[in-house]
């Protein structure tokens, strides 16, 4: 599955969900980016370096590795297959598809806000 991850759009979507009080999952930019990178490499091993390529500007050193252990592995979203290598699980794919839906919802909401703003 090949697609580009729009980091700026994901940040805007995360900010939107945080404004609604949702700070985990859809409101967490690190979570969003990690899951989308893993999903992008579905069926292949995703290297830690692939994830860091997207998350470095949003994460402190060590926080991504910690999140991989405490959230992604613990919840069964990924399986660690080697040092620094992960494969997304079916549960992870479902979570990634949910995130894509949240991004689409954000875009539709933003578009509607823009239309309403222009109404006299």
Spell out what each predicted region is:
Residues 84-90:
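Minor-groove-contacting beta-hairpin "wing" of winged helix-turn-helix DNA-binding domains
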Residues 1, 41-42, 119:
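Long, compositionally biased intrinsically disordered regions
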Residues 93-120:
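Short, amphipathic alpha-helical interaction segments positioned at domain boundaries
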Residues 3-36:
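Short alpha-helical segments that sit at the start of domains
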Residues 43-55:
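Short acidic, hydrophobic short linear motifs in intrinsically disordered regions
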Residues 35-43, 100:
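Short, locally clustered residues in the helix-turn-helix/winged-helix DNA-binding domain
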Residues 1-4, 21, 69-75, 93-96, ...:
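Intrinsically disordered, charged low-complexity linkers and terminal tails
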Residues 57-74, 80:
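Short amphipathic alpha-helical interaction segments
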């Amino acid at each position: 599955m090949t697609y580009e991850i729009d980091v700026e759009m994901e940040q805007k979507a995360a900010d939107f969900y945080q404004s609604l009080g949702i700070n985990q999952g859809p409101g967490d930019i690190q979570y969003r980016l990690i899951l989308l990178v893993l999903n992008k490499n579905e069926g292949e091993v995703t290297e830690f370096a692939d994830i860091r390529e997207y998350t470095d500007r949003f994460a402190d050193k060590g926080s991504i590795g910690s999140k991989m252990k405490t959230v992604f592995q613990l919840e069964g979203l990924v399986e660690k297959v080697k040092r620094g290598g992960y494969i997304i699980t079916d549960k992870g794919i479902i979570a990634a598809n949910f995130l894509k839906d949240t991004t689409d919802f954000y875009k539709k909401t933003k578009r509607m806000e823009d239309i309403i703003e222009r109404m006299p």
